[in-house]
Amino acid sequence: MTLVLFATEYDSAHIVANVLSQTPTDHCVFPLLVKHQVSRRVYFCLQTQKCSDSRRVAPVFAVNNETLQLSRYLAARQPIPLSALIASLDEAETQPLYRHLFRTPVLSPEHGGEVREFKHLVYFHHAAVLRHLNQVFLCPTSPSWFISVFGHTEGQVLLTMAYYLFEGQYSTISTVEEYVRSFCTRDLGTIIPTHASMGEFARLLLGSPFRQRVSAFVAYAVARNRRDYTELEQVDTQINAFRERARLPDTVCVHYVYLAYRTALARARLLEYRRVVAYDADAAPEAQCTREPGFLGRRLSTELLDVMQKYFSLDNFLHDYVETHLLRLDESPHSATSPHGLGLAGYGGRIDGTHLAGFFGTSTQLARQLERINTLSESVFSPLERSLSGLLRLCASLRTAQTYTTGTLTRYSQRRYLLPEPALAPLLERPLPVYRVHLPNDQHVFCAVASETWHRSLFPRDLLRHVPDSRFSDEALTETVWLHDDDVASTSPETQFYYTRHEVFNERLPVFNFVADFDLRLRDGVSGLARHTVFELCRGLRRVWMTVWASLFGYTHPDRHPVYFFKSACPPNSVPVDAAGAPFDDDDYLDYRDERDTEEDEDGKEDKNNVPDNGVFQKTTSSVDTSPPYCRCKGKLGLRIITPFPACTVAVHPSVLRAVAQVLNHAVCLDAELHTLLDPISHPESSLDTGIYHHGRSVRLPYMYKMDQDDGYFMHRRLLPLFIVPDAYREHPLGFVRAQLDLRNLLHHHPPHDLPALPLSPPPRVILSVRDKICPSTEANFIETRSLNVTRYRRRGLTEVLAYHLYGGDGATAAAISDTDLQRLVVTRVWPPLLEHLTQHYEPHVSEQFTAPHVLLFQPHGACCVAVKRRDGARTRDFRCLNYTHRNPQETVQVFIDLRTEHSYALWASLWSRCFTKKCHSNAKNVHISIKIRPPDAPVPPATAV
């Protein structure tokens, strides 16, 4: 049969109804597209509003072509009058299309009883016919509708309509338009004016040379559609196959799917694919779209999946994508490049002294003490900041001065002013540890300790009496060590020192032991873990740690290298557990300059769903196993994992520790055996907290408690030891147990004590850097990094933009910007608009800190961050809080300017501060002003505030 798509200049539903009822009018129908097939019947069609099985047109009436002579109108490109359609109407073929509307019999005396003739049925059901036509069909009466939907050129409109409306393919209009562009690579015909009449539009389509190419285009589009489906099916298969065999955490898996499709269907990739499958006029129809099969799938494998296959394989990841730089030092003790010559000294002091000796004070007392030390040593030593940072610098410094006070020429440290007790003088030659002690009612005290009584104050004398020195399992060995328990805190800092102590990280000291805060987020429904599960988890983590250590640093012997595990004690059954979504288990993520700072939230909320798995306890109404679980933690499982770096190896910058933690975070998800254990019970991604490796941050020591924030005086969640004994100590584990009880093996900056002798001791080394080649930033994982590369427009480099602002277009290719140039840029272009907005929108007591007579000093910290200080003679001072007027205001608020770029040469500057009070969220970043600074040659004002 022959199909004719037509349109009208008047309401199509009424015109069709007139044809059906054989009511002649002066209207015409305009044939737009014709699909020929040898037949004496011609079906006139309209586009349907809904598509059933991709059939987008349906007939509204049929005519006898022997009477109509359709070819005569098509050849003359003329509209068809209604009289011709009425005369040739085939009622036998048309009436079934509307029979469902004529179910109610119509009785008419004028027609001798019941009406049966089709035209009379239409007449008496005229409203139903019109309603049916308007509900089922699209009836556009203007060419502009066709142009806006199908394209603006005759080739685009004709070919798109012919394929989309007549061929019944599962393709959208946008897809068909893409097929047309690939088919007609050079010429799409003339542009159709939107003001054309329906007659002009019909004549254009009926006389278009593209009518002769419809059959070729349809064959190409069918082949292209088949090729597209095959390509996408292959992409789906590859993405799903990798997802099923890769051990991806849940959230990473979701992001991976999005990233994979973005990579496979990126704009540049689709443009390449279009060139591959473009229409080839010289090829046979069956050879169209057959070049380079599997193009998208191959590119996806090359650009993403092959990389991920290696990146998500532990051995390949460590071998190919992690880069470690180590500096070998001179072994001669008198050399300038030896550890002694470089000042790479860890903590001194005694852990088993006769008494506790050190400085204890709140942040206010600390500021006064440091001011006193500055006064006493002003002519000899550099001044110290009156804050925790100053105390850390004092306790880390190895500088000494000469004195004759004893009658002989001797050297002394500035720490003598902090701890003047003569008996402590020999202990002050090496750096001292700085701790933070949590007191009741959320008070905090800072401590610099030279001597303490660790074992005598913390452990009972007979602690190891029942610990065997023979082969025992890890589980049994752990159960032989019993510690006394306390739950009520003391207001005395000296007493509380042995219950709620936290080590403060000091970036000026080398790091000997890697202290990991490991918070494993448990799945919903996991309300307890069996003992076997907990210890297998620790053994699996030890295996991962040793694999990473051996790959990154070498000289690691897994059978004897110690890894110390501590688990946060489970909450009692009577205590509700809150904050399941809290990001950290029990480590304090603060910079602590105010004794009112808070600790982190409690562990997770109770879970309500059940996820059955071996070794996992769920909450059920009837449980087969009535024995209590070994671990009752809900929400997450908190572990402290401590291991020394290999012998004679230290890290000297916190960025190294953050990078190592990032590598371990990824490696934990890649160990096959560990993943099998973790997958049913947890979400292992990003379990290690990298935030603790910042200057001034503190982490709770093993064997210490947390303070209960609700009760104020009660302690809970003590970090208890789990002994995972290396194979070399399996026959005699007592030495390993003693090492795990030794404080010197548990601190960031203390050299390990009693480290086992190795068959081959390495030379002294410094870890300069550890870098993930694909994800150099510790703030983003692999998926996030690749997603940004795929989706985000590329920003201009900061150095390029800074040079453009300094030197104009001639300096835009500068390789580097010196600190002096950066200071000049901040003073001349960045600071004036910031100060203007600061004075306009902030209270005078805030803005006057930045105006005369105060002299400001801008100290670059890299190219993107500039610290703002006030000059006070030879010293620098910080500011009072920019947000609030605190009860005890102090000039300890740090102010910075961040610089960042966009796709143009505009420069964004943000003024932000960091206040250390609880009210200001304890050292959180508070952004005050952000401005956009346009290039010097821009015609608009230099800054726009947001």
From Swiss-Prot:
Compartments (UniProt record): Host nucleus
UniProt-listed Enzyme Commission number(s): 2.7.7.-
Enzymatic class: transferase
Region (Disordered): 596-626
Zinc finger feature spans (CHC2-type): 881-920
GO cellular component, one term: host cell nucleus
Bias kind Polar residues: ranges: 617-626
Major place of residence: host cell
Feature type site, description Essential for primase activity: D517, D519
Keywords: DNA replication, Host nucleus, Host-virus interaction, Metal-binding, Transferase, Zinc, Zinc-finger
GO molecular function: DNA-directed RNA polymerase activity; zinc ion binding
Biological processes annotated in GO: bidirectional double-stranded viral DNA replication; DNA replication
Assembly mode: Associates with the helicase and the primase-associated factor to form the helicase-primase factor.
Known function: Essential component of the helicase/primase complex. Unwinds the DNA at the replication forks and generates single-stranded DNA for both leading and lagging strand synthesis. The primase initiates primer synthesis and thereby produces large amount of short RNA primers on the lagging strand that the polymerase elongates using dNTPs.
Family classification: Belongs to the herpesviridae DNA primase family.
Name used for this protein in its record: DNA primase
Species for this entry: Human cytomegalovirus (strain AD169)
Gene designation: UL70
